[in-house]
Amino acid sequence: MSDDWVEIYTDGACKGNPGPGGWGALLIYKGVKRELWGGEPDTTNNRMELMAAIRALAELKRPCKVRLVTDSQYVMQGINDWMPNWKKRGWKTASKQPVKNADLWQQLDEQVNRHEVSWQWVRGHTGHPGNEQADLLANRGVVQAKRQPIV
């Protein structure tokens, strides 16, 4: 990977679905690592996967070339297959239903448009160092979320 690229590894976690959830992201640029995490007391795993990518991309101060690595098929399919049609249909599915998590998909779309993003899927929990670190961070977010009041 060229030094011009920012590498981002993201993951989401949820204890119960819905339940307390966390997101984590590892950003690497020119050998410097930055860890981000957070959580919500009542959420879903898919929302946390999306939040990880959104928050990581939003952290970048200027437009960048990004390689974003995720273990989420939901995020990969959404970004590559579903989103173009959702946008054409006014954020509706093929069956004319509102897109689930449209608020986050729209935020992700906004962030992706700021950067040049190359998406890569990796299988989770297979020892990939960046993905494993993102998983640890997401679980840190779950612990944080469990301490937050729901109201």
From Swiss-Prot:
Sorted UniProt keywords: Cytoplasm, Endonuclease, Hydrolase, Magnesium, Metal-binding, Nuclease
EC number: 3.1.26.4
GO biological process: DNA replication, removal of RNA primer
Catalytic activity: Endonucleolytic cleavage to 5'-phosphomonoester
PROSITE patterns named among the record's database cross-references: RNASE_H_1 (PS50879)
Molecular function GO labels: magnesium ion binding; nucleic acid binding; RNA-DNA hybrid ribonuclease activity
Cofactor descriptive note: Binds 1 Mg(2+) ion per subunit. May bind a second metal ion at a regulatory site, or after substrate binding.
Binding site for Mg(2+) 1: D11, E49, D71
Function: Endonuclease that specifically degrades the RNA of RNA-DNA hybrids.
Homology family: Belongs to the RNase H family.
Protein name: Ribonuclease H
Gene: rnhA
